[in-house]
């Protein structure tokens, strides 16, 4: 960008927006002192100077700026307009006038006049200009909150920040603010907050961290932190060597954070070597632990935004987890030690490697990541209990005992109460006895086995999985494993000269198929076998889509899910199957705002006794959109991919414009007006902010910047003007017909 002009030669010419860096991130924008002095106004004799204007307000004790009649600026001027603003009085005026429902946001649901007059910098505050409409006023609210946060009492604000193209604004916020707001690292700088657990229901909740035996340097590091800062009450524990369901259950009395990867650095203050946590991105602002498949989706957005360092760091954290905990965990808390999440490590690794392959250490990064993925494949997904030996397909089927510990026992009171009465015990007595095997209830065992499987699937919750999840060979999981097999085969063949040695410390000892020397042929054969099994058990020719297969009943299920498109993402479908899905499945699953999680018919009727589930109709989720777009593009269905991406991006942008910059975890893709409103369990993450959103939601942020790579330039311009897809396509068709008619 061009630096700010000096007070000499450049004063008289028209200045572009870029020359004033008006789209700088908030920290730069509001902490650059020179920006907020009014160099641009020429001398005037009949007006306030900037300082005297503000001082006069203070002398008069005014909380609102005095209004001057007949001194409005023209609506158009040759250069970008700027405003002289007193932050606190303007913020109070704005909120009292426009935030009529008092939720510290300005939305289309507020019924204020939707106009506020601001003093212009070009007139030294003498003239005013009206800011109109929900979008500009809500942007003003957000900018004032940010200015206040950075300690500014008065600012010169560029109008361009208020009427910025919403696609550009949201993209900029994601890149400059949201990723930063969602980035965490686990070390002394953050352990007090990160190690505290809102799901710690014990009598003495305190920060606690578990260190694997293979990382003694981390145990030494955190022990020193605990000794140096006794006020933290930090409990540093070694993790047991062998992790079993019984050990995990007993650890629930002392739940804690699990250590992730650290790097050796030199402390700039002392000059001594120390450890620093490798950073990672969390799903939402209230989280502090590393999550599983959220991290993959986030990495796609990070790579678009050139945050390769963060995406690489997250891969390294995953490798640490596989090496020391045996798997990529649902999240890095002790009660998740038996549970994984949908596996995406090979694709994540290869995307990062493609960005860094010319850097020193890139090949070693790829080697370590491949070792981790191979170990995870053997020890988690193709071993008991997740492998179904009959079909050769895999299931979400984590080990575990008793009631899932991250939920309050009361969450399952309707399930457990009858059993407590049956055994003539109090609720708490029964839960303890059942969890510790003192009472045997096979029906409850099955219920919680399926409940754990739903949570491992990442699709918690949905009627697709209720009461059967652990028995299902799903199209989503088996597509991901097919992708592992083809990725590993290709990488061994093309990068490691078709011989890949596995050292003893990376060998999966619980699976006889694991080898010390891996070749591409071994993995090619696995991929072919899995494709044959997927075609036999999961593909439905008549329906033109994939369904889950119940390994207990030996029958194909009939729930129509957007995960059918994961097969396109993984490359498991043949061209005929891909075309059938576009013809038959896509019309059933496409809605106003993109892809539905499932069809209305598959969900069934809902009511008081059968409430909405968040992974069912009418909700849409970022991962389903991303994988479908990528898969459709892979098979040449570019127009369909662009259409779905446009609808999703339009819905997010419209909610962002109408509802004070909101970006949430999931959307009701059937609602044109307020799709961020979700009436299902768990509510919606990303709604609860005051004034300005700081984080958005991880995988939705990623879907936005990734989706903008899918749509074409014409579509992006139309999104910036909030043009609905049908209106856009009608205009495109009219232009096309006009162009055809003009051809000779």
UniProtKB/Swiss-Prot annotation:
Q: Which InterPro entries does this entry report, sorted A to Z? A: 6-hairpin_glycosidase_sf, 6hp_glycosidase-like_sf, Glyco_hydro_37, Glyco_hydro_37_CS, Trehalase_Ca-bd
Organism of derivation: Neurospora crassa (strain ATCC 24698 / 74-OR23-1A / CBS 708.71 / DSM 1257 / FGSC 987)
EC number(s) given by UniProt? 3.2.1.28
- Disulfide connectivity for this sequence is none
- Compartments where found: Cytoplasm
Tell me what gene encodes this: treB
Residue numbers binding substrate = 286, 293-294, 330, 339-341, 406, 455, 458
Q: Which UniProt keywords apply?
A: Calcium, Cytoplasm, Glycosidase, Hydrolase, Metal-binding
Catalyzed reactions per annotation:
alpha,alpha-trehalose + H2O = alpha-D-glucose + beta-D-glucose
Name of this protein: Cytosolic neutral trehalase
The record places the active site at: 460, 665
Q: Which SUPFAM superfamilies match?
A: Six-hairpin glycosidases
Which EC main class describes this enzyme?
hydrolase
Main location group: cytoplasm
Name a GO molecular-function annotation.
Answer: calcium ion binding
UniProt function note: Hydrolyzes intracellular trehalose to glucose.
PROSITE patterns referenced in this protein's UniProt entry, alphabetically? TREHALASE_1, TREHALASE_2
Q: Which cofactor does it need?
A: Ca(2+)
GO CC, any one term:
alpha,alpha-trehalose-phosphate synthase complex (UDP-forming)
